[in-house]
């Protein structure tokens, strides 16, 4: 029972860390050669508590290659990032560290596990 | 900060070219590092970074006064352009303007400064001595490249989303022509005789040559590289030699610079910034220089330096030999490189 309660707290903390508004601006750089993303979701590493679609923060609601996306509502921490490209393929980047860095890059090598 | 990757690539390459003859170069080059919020100062004689200057947030476009004494750095996230003294690196003044991406000085006289304000669909005009705004001009969506003709009478701005090259007269800033070009025009460069302007289209994969008297399209230059998907060919920066014979076009993720005959509008060859270099120490081929977006010549035009955004370095191309002869690690995501005129 205690374990369940603890797990719930951890999960809740995860949700909070994604949804809580923070003062720092975070960014994702799309450094792929030709891939545009219509979905960019972050969840605390090891969870599937995906936050809102951050791609909607962009003017055209997509993260184009060569473009930078402002990420909102994040606190420092480790995140998994779910990327959805224009063809609907989904790719996961694991353990993106936004503890010290305020940005991360999506490269072509980040897209090797897309389904 | 230099990434580990940049160091691993840069050191063996430096070893590989250490014995290669190179004419003496003097002066300084400046690379704006978008992700690091710094400008790297490269001593061309040593071909290494001798100073890293902290800047405001997101340094991208830059321009230099004609004597090289002041470097103007567009700081997109700080909503200003800082004017840096290139001897002391003190900030001599700031122009407060929203989301500046590129800026171009009118010559001669170092004034005014034309700024593309990306998110405001404006070109703003500034006096850099008083840092006062002289005017503003509405543009299409997402203004990008800024260029001023050699005689200072014509201003060209490219609008990334509306796919136009827009032309304005000096000093009225009257809009005299709008020319549709292929998607995502990023950069404009006038030929030195002022007769044409070359506009790169990143998504279109082309360079459009426009007559500056009639504003008619003279030609559209296409690029094709064997073994490379056409979508990887994304032209951005264009550097034209002073004799208007050669243009060097940065092709982004193609990791190459196209060498184009200016009179014929014809691609002559491609220089790989990601050139394969044999290193006697490590016995393997190395790739350097990923995603070049902008380049600048040394004053004698013997060398061309490219800012490579993904490999965090600057490639040095021997213009006569058309090959990369050196690589200088700089900060993260170098956007543009400029070279002091003296």
Set out the residue ranges of the language-model regions.
Chain B
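Short aromatic/hydrophobic-glycine micro-motifs
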Residues: 1-2, 33
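N-terminal export leaders
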Residues: 2-8
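Predominantly soluble domains enriched in secretory-pathway, periplasmic, or organellar proteins
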Residues: 8, 12-342
């Amino acid at each position: 029972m205690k374990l369940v309660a603890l797990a719930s707290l951890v999960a809740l903390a995860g949700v909070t860390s994604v949804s809580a508004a923070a003062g720092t601006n975070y960014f994702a750089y799309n450094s792929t050669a030709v891939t545009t993303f219509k979905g960019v979701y972050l969840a605390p590493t090891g969870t599937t508590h995906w936050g809102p679609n951050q791609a909607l923060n962009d003017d055209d609601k997509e993260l184009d290659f060569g473009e930078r996306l402002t990420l909102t509502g994040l606190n420092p921490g480790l995140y998994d990032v779910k990327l959805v490209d224009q063809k609907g393929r989904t790719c996961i980047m694991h353990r993106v560290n936004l503890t010290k860095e305020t940005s991360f890059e999506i490269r072509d090598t980040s897209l090797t596990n897309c389904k | 900060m230099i990434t580990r990757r940049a160091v691993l690539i840069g050191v063996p390459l430096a070893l590989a070219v250490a014995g290669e003859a190179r004419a003496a170069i003097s002066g300084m080059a400046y690379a704006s590092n978008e992700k690091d919020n710094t400008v790297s100062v490269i001593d061309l004689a040593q071909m290494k970074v001798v100073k890293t200057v902290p800047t405001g947030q997101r340094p991208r476009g830059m321009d230099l006064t004609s004597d090289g004494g002041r470097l103007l750095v567009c700081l997109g996230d700080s909503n200003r352009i800082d004017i840096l003294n290139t001897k002391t690196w003190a900030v001599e003044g700031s122009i407060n303007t929203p989301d500046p991406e590129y800026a171009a000085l009118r010559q001669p006289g170092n004034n005014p400064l034309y700024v593309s304000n990306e998110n405001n669909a404006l070109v703003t005009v500034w006096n850099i001595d008083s840092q006062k705004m002289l005017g503003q001009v509405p543009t299409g969506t997402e203004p990008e490249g800024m260029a001023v003709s050699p005689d200072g009478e014509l201003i060209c701005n490219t609008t990334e989303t509306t796919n136009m090259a827009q032309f304005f007269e000096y000093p009225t800033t009257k809009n005299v022509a709008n020319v549709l070009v292929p998607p995502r025009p990023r950069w404009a460069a006038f030929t030195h005789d002022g007769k044409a302007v070359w506009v790169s289209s990143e998504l279109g994969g082309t360079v459009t040559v426009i007559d500056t008297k009639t504003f008619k399209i003279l030609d559209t230059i296409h690029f094709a590289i064997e073994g490379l998907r056409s979508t990887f060919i994304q032209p951005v920066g264009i550097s034209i030699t002073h004799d208007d014979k050669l243009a060097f076009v940065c092709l982004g993720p193609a990791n190459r610079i196209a060498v184009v005959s200016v009179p014929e509008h014809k691609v002559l060859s491609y220089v790989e910034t990601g050139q394969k270099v044999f290193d006697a120490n490590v016995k393997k081929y190395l790739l350097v220089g990923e995603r070049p977006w902008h380049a600048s010549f040394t004053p004698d035009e013997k060398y061309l330096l490219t800012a490579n955004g993904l490999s965090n370095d600057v490639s040095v191309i021997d213009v006569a030999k058309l090959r990369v002869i050196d690589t200088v690690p700089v900060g993260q995501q170098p956007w543009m490189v400029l070279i002091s005129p003296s």
